């Protein structure tokens, strides 16, 4: 590489660092006062801003609003509120297949005790995988009202592609599903000696307790297993109709699996939930509907109304009348980050979409087996 090329590359790196230094001042939410030197637009890897109030079109309109609702869901779980999305004002995103979204929105709480005024919220959602539901919300806060659970000031701002997708700096390590007392003591010693961050030990405790809420998503349970009332709570129709997050989970599974639906809101409007079961770490909790509030849960949703699901290398039976299944895992981390991971069940794995099933033919269901809990 020539001296001139080295100089140009170093100049580009300098501009890049300066962009992210400025973006970090607002945790990636407010970019209005950030300017780039002439000729560097399109060269610097940065966030792309979208003004939803002025622009008639912007990427993934349905999905971005679902991400905004997901952030409010996290806030409501932590604070016991009922905030709902009123208006998506703006968002910034990375130009990647797997992106991070920094959203500013207006929300209101319909509870009369909360008053009728709207609040401005900031929500950050990071995608962890392309073509399926795997997202994390690390920031969901009223603007200028952050606290430790909503955004950590202990670690520097890290954009997604730098490997710091979690805005509150949670350090992810590979941990077995069940740690022995000896292993926990060794981790505790390493933390005391300053060899590991303190939250690694906390993560280990969660891993030990997490069990079925780690690793791959479970298969759809058999009817006999679902009838185990100690293990599964069958959500009443009145409850899921009053609980907007269950339908939001379903819409997120479908839209993240097929992002083309993000410009087709009419597809989601046809969805009809048939039944819902929830599995939590706490069994026989009284009253049973308290399990709806669990920080760690598997939500099993049977639904219809999706005429032609699309998923990577899979085809499904066609028809809105077909009952389909989706599984969503919810895990609230010990520092307040909320993760959702989900999948559509069924379909046949093939190489080419030209082999699509005709209407009326039976699709392969998720393998039915008892889960180990």
UniProtKB/Swiss-Prot annotation:
Keyword Acetylation: yes
Chain positions found as N-acetylthreonine: 2
Signal peptide: none
PANTHER family per record: (RAPE) HYPOTHETICAL PROTEIN (PTHR31260:SF77), CYSTATIN/MONELLIN SUPERFAMILY PROTEIN (PTHR31260)
Residues annotated as transmembrane: none
Organism in which the protein naturally occurs: Arabidopsis thaliana (Mouse-ear cress)
Lineage, top ranks: Eukaryota, Viridiplantae, Streptophyta, Embryophyta, Tracheophyta
Family: Belongs to the UPF0725 (EMB2204) family.
A Pfam short name: protein_MS5
InterPro entries for the chain: MS5
Domain of life: Eukaryota
The name this protein goes by in its record: UPF0725 protein At1g23950
Keywords: Acetylation
């Amino acid at each position: 590489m020539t001296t001139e090329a080295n100089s140009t590359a170093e100049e580009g790196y300098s501009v890049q660092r300066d962009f992210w230094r400025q973006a970090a001042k607002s945790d990636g939410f407010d970019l209005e006062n950030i300017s780039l030197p002439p000729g560097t637009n399109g060269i610097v890897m940065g966030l792309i801003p979208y003004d939803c109030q002025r622009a008639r079109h912007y990427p993934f309109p349905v999905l971005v609003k679902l991400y905004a609702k997901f952030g409010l869901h996290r806030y409501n779980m932590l604070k016991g509120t009922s905030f709902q999305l009123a208006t998506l004002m703006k968002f910034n995103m990375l130009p990647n297949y797997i992106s991070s979204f920094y959203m500013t929105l207006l929300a209101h709480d319909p509870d009369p005790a909360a008053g009728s005024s709207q609040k401005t919220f900031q929500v950050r959602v990071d995608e962890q995988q392309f073509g399926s539901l795997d997202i994390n919300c690390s920031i969901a806060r009223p603007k200028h009202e952050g606290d430790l659970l909503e955004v950590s000031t202990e670690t520097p701002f890290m954009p997604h592609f730098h490997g710091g997708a979690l805005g509150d700096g949670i350090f992810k390590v590979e941990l077995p599903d069940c740690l022995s007392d000896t292993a926990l003591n060794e981790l505790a010693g390493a933390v005391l000696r300053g060899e590991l961050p303190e939250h690694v030990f906390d993560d280990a405790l969660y891993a030990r307790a997490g069990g079925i809420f780690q690793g791959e998503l479970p298969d759809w349970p058999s009817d006999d297993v679902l009838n185990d009332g100690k293990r599964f709570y069958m959500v009443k129709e009145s409850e899921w109709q009053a609980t907007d997050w269950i339908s939001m989970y379903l819409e997120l599974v479908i839209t993240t699996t097929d992002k083309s639906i993000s410009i087709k809101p009419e597809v989601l409007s046809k969805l009809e939930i048939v039944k819902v079961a929830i599995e939590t770490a706490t069994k026989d909790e009284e009253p049973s509907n308290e399990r709806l509030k669990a920080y760690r849960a598997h939500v099993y949703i049977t639904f219809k109304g999706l005429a032609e699901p699309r998923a990577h290398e899979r085809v499904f039976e066609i028809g809105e009348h077909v009952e389909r299944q989706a599984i969503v895992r919810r895990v609230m981390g010990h520092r307040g980050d909320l993760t959702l991971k989900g999948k559509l069940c069924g379909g046949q794995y093939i190489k080419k979409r030209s082999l699509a099933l005709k209407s009326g033919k039976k699709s392969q269901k998720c393998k039915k087996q008892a889960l180990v809990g």
